[in-house]
UniProtKB/Swiss-Prot annotation:
Protein name from the UniProt record: UvrABC system protein B
Organism: Paenarthrobacter aurescens (strain TC1)
Subunit details: Forms a heterotetramer with UvrA during the search for lesions. Interacts with UvrC in an incision complex.
Biological role: The UvrABC repair system catalyzes the recognition and processing of DNA lesions. A damage recognition complex composed of 2 UvrA and 2 UvrB subunits scans DNA for abnormalities. Upon binding of the UvrA(2)B(2) complex to a putative damaged site, the DNA wraps around one UvrB monomer. DNA wrap is dependent on ATP binding by UvrB and probably causes local melting of the DNA helix, facilitating insertion of UvrB beta-hairpin between the DNA strands. Then UvrB probes one DNA strand for the presence of a lesion.
Pfam families: Helicase_C, ResIII, UVR, UvrB, UvrB_inter
Lineage summary: Bacteria, Bacillati, Actinomycetota, Actinomycetes, Micrococcales
Stretches of the chain forming a coiled coil according to its record: none
């Protein structure tokens, strides 16, 4: 993609900064992967056992090849986990996070059997929307970019050409009319708001214009002297503190779906033409109700687009707005990458089938909407990429998995192996036991493990069996919890943390104990009904489940079965193969396996500590003032915003700290942990300032 030639890209090297060096199989894997990529191999597979550090290997690979990278992950949770790991390993590079910005999404649909139309309903997470804009902004302004994304990256996004065409360049000393800039911001879908200044808005104070771009947390101040830009500064929107002076900055549109007036006029004409043609077809088929429904709905949308430049569901007209021909592929995040980008597919055995399934799932719903007059046929062009379209857009690809699928193994010339763990830990021993008396045997094994302060995972085939087993174990005095599909994301994280901390000893689940579960305290994984062939007991599922016990020095897996199925045989054979390699390596190098000591901490812990510290500081401040509370939190915060941090008295800082602490807890309650962490950092800074005032005797 040669779009950003007019933009001065930041060119900085990818650099891994870590106290750890590649160990175990990592040096060999990094060297072989680098060689294959540099030799131009299109598809490369890394078969990496659980816990061998595939993420770190990927970071070191990116450092070696020095190319922008898209990392595709199967779900939002793992994407966030991986993005955080990359941010720690590559702190000086742009590591971005691109997932669906819907907290809740109900697409519009029509159920013909019951004549039920379901309106589109959604809830957008503004922080995730900012991160999506941050990803496209980074891709267009620098080369040292890693974007960790879910399959939402193959869904339609506005064209990079229009996104860049809508951009405004701010350069110190350049000639620019202030009013022209304001009109430009409005055309980029920013809203003027002089009272409530937040992301996606701008405000004007005489010759000074301030804006918070959609992809930023900081504000930009542009100071004019006549028709010349005199100063450009980056500042903190809350405190007004100037952080740095800028020579040149780019401001990108507030929406990825930006269309200039000429493009919108052309789109409206095309929509009107398509509507006329479609109405003839429906009326010719005597579908008068459908024709009337389509006429009313589309006419209303056209009026909104003419008057407001936007309408609900505007994405359904994207083929006309983009100026594409019917049936052609939509633009997506991949189009924002330069031509030489590297694709990394994490847990490829799950992610690759996901990519292939997206298009058909979307089409089956859209066909009903078109057939029954709720949408024009062009709505079917607002879609994810088809499999072959996806393949056309990607270049060299690295597939990561402990259990690579047939597709990726068929594409690659063999695979790179990463079996040895840096800690020396080996794959667990697999023991097959008869199903007769399995529950009593399981109970005995649980008691043995709990005496050693170790944890147990039990996986069953059905919800009923999981519930009954949990009740049975509770009746026998076992501290046990049941993890099922109805448990929300936050509660799931809490359950896993409580298991590690020893609040309970046994976790029972169905299909929730596979990829991405990192529990070093678990020494036993028990698989009930291991000989029942099917998705949950396929060789891939079994190997992934076995991997959950690979983080413990004394890890074991017990399979309860009356016969050994082909899937079991393959899983056991592969585990024993890896185990033999690991044992031999440890023997040859005199390595004694070390238990994995992973810190049991999360953002909720940090917030609790921060909260206690804040309370102590504020109480001390009030005691120093003879118990007086001073101004309200809101008034104090407002004074700090108006006068700036340096000029604020201590009681106003107290107000701001109280207000931010409340916002921090609100963000955590809504699972916006990144927002909570940022507010926590602001609170820390304000408390440092307040402590300095107290020690100087000004508080």
């Amino acid at each position: 993609m040669s779009l950003a030639q007019e933009i001065n890209r930041v060119v900085a090297p990818f650099e891994v900064i870590s106290e750890f060096k590649p160990a175990g199989d990592q040096p060999t894997a990094i060297a072989e992967l680098t060689e294959r990529i540099n030799n131009g191999e299109k598809d490369v597979v890394l078969l990496g056992a659980t816990g061998t550090g595939k993420s770190a290997t990927t970071a070191w690979l990116i450092e070696q090849v020095q190319r922008p990278t898209l990392v595709m992950v199967q779900n939002k949770t793992l994407a966030a986990q991986l993005a955080n790991e990359f941010r720690e390993l590559l702190p000086n590079n742009a590591v971005e996070y691109f997932v669906s910005y819907y907290d809740y999404y109900q697409p519009e649909a029509y159920v013909a059997q019951t004549d039920t139309f379901i309106e589109k309903d959604s809830s957008i997470n503004e922080e995730v929307e900012r991160l999506r804009h941050s990803a496209t902004n980074a891709l267009l302004t620098r080369r040292d970019v890693i974007v960790v994304a879910t399959v939402s990256c193959i869904y339609g996004l506005g064209t990079p050409e229009e996104y860049i065409a809508g951009m405004v360049t701010l350069r110190k000393g350049a000639e620019m009319n202030r009013d022209h800039l304001l009109r430009k911001f409005v055309s980029m879908q920013y809203a003027r708001n002089d009272m409530d200044f937040h992301r996606g808005t701008f405000r004007v104070r005489g010759d000074t214009v301030e804006i918070i771009p959609m992809y930023e947390e900081l504000a930009i101040r542009i100071e004019f002297f006549g028709d010349e830009i005199e100063n450009i500064q980056t500042l903190h929107p809350l405190t007004g503190e100037v952080l740095r002076d800028e020579e040149e900055m780019y401001v990108f549109p507030a929406s990825h779906y930006v269309a200039g007036p000429e493009r919108m006029a052309r789109a409206i004409k095309r929509i009107e033409d398509e509507l006329a043609d479609r109405l003839k077809v429906l009326e010719g088929q005597n579908k008068l109700v459908e024709a009337q429904r389509l006429r009313m709905r589309t006419t209303y949308d056209l009026e909104m687009m003419q008057q407001m430049g936007f309408c609900n569901g505007i994405e359904n007209y994207s083929v006309h707005i983009d100026g594409r021909n019917p049936g052609t592929a939509p633009h997506c995040l991949i189009d924002y990458f330069p031509d030489d980008f590297l694709l990394v597919v994490d847990e490829s055995h799950v992610t690759i089938p996901q990519i292939g399934a997206m298009y058909e799932g979307d089409m089956s719903r859209k066909r009903n909407l078109v057939d029954f007059g709720f949408r024009l046929p062009s709505a079917m062009d607002n879609r994810p990429l088809k499999w072959d379209e996806f393949l056309e857009r990607i270049g060299q690809t690295v597939y990561l998995s402990a259990t690579p699928g047939k597709y990726e193994l068929g594409k690659a010339d063999g695979y790179v192996q990463q079996i040895i763990r840096p800690t020396g830990l080996i794959d667990p021993e697999v023991v097959v036991k008869p199903t007769k008396g399995q529950i009593d045997d399981l109970l005995g094994e649980i008691r043995t493990r709990t005496e050693k302060n170790e944890r147990v995972l039990v996986t069953t085939l059905t919800k009923r069996m999981a519930e009954d087993l949990t009740d049975y174990l509770v009746g026998h005095g076992v501290k046990v919890e049941y993890l099922h599909s109805d448990v929300d994301t936050l509660r799931r994280v809490e359950l896993l943390r409580e298991l590690r901390m020893g609040v309970f000893d046994v976790l029972v689940g169905i299909n929730l104990l596979r990829e991405g579960l990192d529990l070093p305290e678990v020494s036993l994984v028990s698989i009930l009904d291991a000989d029942k062939e099917g998705f949950l007991r396929s060789s891939t599922s079994l190997i992934q489940t076995i991997g959950r016990a690979a983080r413990n020095v004394s890890g074991q897996v017990h399979m309860y079965a009356d016969r050994i199925t082909d899937s079991m045989a393959h899983a056991i054979e592969e585990t024993n193969r890896r185990r033999a390699i690991q044992v031999q390596y440890n023997t040859d190098h005199g390595i004694d396996p070390q238990p994995l000591r992973k810190k049991i901490a999360d953002i909720t812990d940090q917030l609790a500590k921060e909260d206690a510290d804040t309370q102590e500081l504020l109480n001390n401040n009030r005691l120093a003032k003879g118990g007086k509370r001073g101004k309200s939190a809101a008034k104090g915060a407002a004074t700090v915003r108006q006068d700036g941090l340096a000029a604020a008295p201590a009681e106003d800082l107290v107000g701001l700290i109280e207000q931010l602490t409340e916002q921090m807890h609100g963000a955590a309650a809504e699972l916006q942990f990144e927002v909570a962490a940022r507010i926590r950092d602001e609170v820390k800074e304000l408390k440092r300032e307040l402590r300095q005032m107290q020690s100087a005797g000004h508080a």
